[in-house]
């Protein structure tokens, strides 16, 4: 049986992620929600997936993971709510809208073994390029 994933935030990026999740092996179902009450049913209908009126029901409904693409100001609270329910979490950047909130999220996450990933790719960062080149050249040996 595949995973049931919650998607919170259905703007451009949230919709993009939801569409990709629907074609991902191992994902059987999505539950989508957005703070815009009109957007949620429209996107749910468009994608033919379940919906919820607000983020709490998906987090309380036995989902296997959550993808947060909501407004930046809501990230910290949503990450913490998911982690406290032992739900593996992927959140678009930024992790929070302040240093204090970021520290709070980190402290909450460190109290559990729940995976949390922030979608902050650095593909063209010089340090990443150097690490990528080292892996590709075999300089670091076999990476798994």
Please state what every model-predicted region is.
Residues 17, 47-108:
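Beta-loop-alpha module in the N-terminal Rossmann-like domain of NAD(P)-dependent dehydrogenases
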Residues 11-13, 71-74, 122-124:
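Short beta->alpha connector loops
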Residues 96-144:
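A contiguous active-site-proximal alpha/beta segment in oxidoreductase catalytic domains
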Residues 40, 75-76, 128:
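Short, well-ordered alpha-helical microsegments
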Residues 1-47:
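N-terminal Rossmann-like dinucleotide-binding module
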Residues 6-8, 90, 117:
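Conserved hydrophobic packing residues within short motifs/helices of P-loop NTPase cores
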Residues 31, 65, 115:
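Short, Asp-centered acidic motifs that coordinate Mg2+ and/or phosphate
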